[in-house]
């Protein structure tokens, strides 16, 4: 029996790993998040204007945010790339042989790209966004998944509420490239005829005929659900997420606590109280929220003194969430960047090399923070109007989710003090309004310096540190 290998600690993530032939051996857990032992193919099902693309985009954004490499494949976009000008609904008529041929070619081209992404490029989840309304088409896609070793999960969106369908048409389809420069009434009429082209051949997922498939059916954007044969952890995460999202119009307000005493001194972390300007900001925030006249607003804070002091000025009930606490800087808590460079120059350089994955000694990384904040995202998706009073790193993670930012961008998103970000979900994304509340504050944003080498001189390591007392 071979003797156990020696262990060494990864300097970036602080994870113990085997040491072999004088070098650390790369273990699967160091390569990235892996929640399934084989890739997953998510297949959308449903008539046009049922919110399939909305669901596809949200699901893709969520999975990428939690660290699961995911890509959306929209067959409609493949069709637009192949047929440069859209004329009318007649392209979708079931007896239009040329249209049928082109649409099949587009589906096959998309599936070929799915295969490349999942089998060659390291993808974990592909979302195949098309109508897929016939049992024959779904069987073809399922067989494609079987042949390539993928687990297939169907997501069907059924909608019979005419108001919801009409709203989908107005919101999404009239902004579609198919209807650029077309009269609104004419576009609506054409799109309704396009839906009719699919209705006669539409075969919904059936509890008897499709009992061996893994799927979720979503009725009228979340009024009820049918879930069948959830096969693994990633599918259960997908189901849980889809059962939490809604389309009710609302806004989410994100802001940091008022300026703290440690912000003034350029010290990170800790649990300080507000500075005089921070207390002034909390009064301005109270006035701003009052002026907005927001219906049924919920207010959330962390369990740290500075966010609670900020919320107290609002004179409204608020909930304290421990998971909203600032990133734990471990041994670097309450230090200035200059002190970190002086005491831990290697750590300071490693953090600049990969700020998202770098974990402070005895502390956290941004990657850890994202995992910690997932319950907050789930609850934000369930809620309507919410104000979250949090911290710089936490706000960056939440903002990255709503704005679909990559992990490399996330730690450098600008979240200045005394500024409220109003996020309003729209058709396929999020509208952002930045509102500065006219109270001066120190700058706490540090850009990545050009030189991130571990042997760099101190002045080059500290070149982007903001001014402080």
Swiss-Prot record:
Q: Which residues carry this modification: Phosphoserine?
A: 29
Site positions (Transition state stabilizer) are 391
Q: Which GO terms describe its cellular component?
A: cytosol
Gene3D superfamilies according to UniProt: P-loop containing nucleotide triphosphate hydrolases, Phosphoglycerate mutase-like
Query: Which InterPro entries does the protein's record reference?
Result: 6Pfruct_kin, 6Phosfructo_kin, His_Pase_superF_clade-1, His_PPase_superfam, P-loop_NTPase, PG/BPGM_mutase_AS
Q: What PROSITE patterns has UniProt attached to this entry?
A: PG_MUTASE (PS00175)
**Where in this protein does the record put region Fructose-2,6-bisphosphatase?**
250-469
Q: How is its activity regulated?
A: The most important regulatory mechanism of these opposing activities is by phosphorylation and dephosphorylation of the enzyme.
Question: Which Enzyme Commission numbers does its entry carry?
Answer: 2.7.1.105, 3.1.3.46
| Molecular function as annotated in GO | 6-phosphofructo-2-kinase activity; ATP binding; fructose-2,6-bisphosphate 2-phosphatase activity
Q: Where is this region: 6-phosphofructo-2-kinase?
A: 1-249
Q: What is this protein called?
A: 6-phosphofructo-2-kinase/fructose-2,6-bisphosphatase 4
Q: State the organism's lineage.
A: Eukaryota, Metazoa, Chordata, Craniata, Vertebrata
């Amino acid at each position: 029996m071979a003797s156990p290998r020696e262990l060494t600690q990864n300097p970036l993530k602080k994870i113990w790993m085997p040491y072999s032939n004088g070098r650390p051996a790369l273990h699967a857990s160091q390569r990235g998040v892996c929640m399934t032992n084989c890739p997953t193919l998510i297949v959308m099902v449903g008539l046009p204007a049922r919110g399939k693309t909305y669901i596809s985009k949200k699901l893709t954004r969520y999975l990428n945010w939690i660290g699961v490499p995911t890509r959306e494949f929209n067959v409609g976009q493949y069709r637009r790339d192949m047929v440069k000008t859209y004329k009318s609904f007649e392209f979708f008529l079931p007896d239009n042989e040329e249209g049928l041929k082109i649409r099949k070619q587009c589906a096959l081209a998309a599936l070929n790209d799915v295969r490349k992404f999942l089998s060659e490029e390291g993808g974990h989840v592909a979302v195949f966004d098309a109508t897929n309304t016939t049992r024959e088409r779904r069987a073809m896609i399922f067989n494609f998944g079987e042949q390539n070793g993928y687990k297939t999960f169907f997501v069907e969106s059924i909608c019979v509420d005419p108001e919801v369908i009409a709203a989908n048409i107005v919101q999404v389809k009239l902004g579609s490239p198919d209807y650029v420069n077309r009269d609104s009434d004419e576009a609506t009429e054409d799109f309704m005829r396009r839906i009719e082209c699919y209705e006669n051949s539409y075969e919904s997922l059936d509890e008897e005929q499709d009992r061996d498939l893994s799927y979720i059916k979503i009725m009228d954007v979340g009024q009820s659900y049918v879930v069948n044969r959830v096969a693994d952890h990633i599918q259960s995460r997908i189901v849980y997420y889809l059962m939490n999202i809604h389309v009710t119009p609302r806004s989410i307000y994100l802001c940091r606590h008022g300026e703290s005493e440690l912000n003034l001194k350029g010290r990170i972390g800790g649990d300080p109280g507000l500075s005089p300007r921070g207390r002034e900001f909390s009064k301005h925030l109270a006035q701003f929220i009052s002026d907005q006249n927001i219906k049924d607003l919920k207010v959330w804070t962390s369990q740290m003194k500075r966010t609670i002091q900020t919320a107290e000025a609002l004179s409204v009930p608020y909930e304290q969430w421990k998971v909203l606490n600032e990133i734990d800087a471990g041994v670097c808590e309450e230090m200035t960047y200059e002190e970190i460079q002086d005491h831990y120059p290697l750590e300071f350089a490693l953090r600049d090399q990969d700020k998202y994955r770098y974990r402070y000694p005895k502390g956290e990384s941004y990657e850890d923070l994202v995992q910690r904040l997932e319950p907050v995202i789930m609850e934000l998706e369930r809620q309507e109007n919410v104000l979250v009073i949090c911290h710089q790193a936490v706000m960056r993670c939440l903002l990255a989710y709503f704005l679909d930012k990559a992990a490399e961008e996330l730690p450098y998103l600008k979240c200045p003090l005394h500024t409220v970000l109003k996020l309003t979900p729209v058709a396929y994304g999020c509208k952002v309004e930045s509102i500065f509340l006219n109270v001066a504050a120190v700058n706490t944003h540090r850009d990545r310096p050009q030189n991130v080498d571990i042997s760099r001189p101190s002045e080059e390591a500290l070149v982007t540190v903001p001014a402080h007392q």
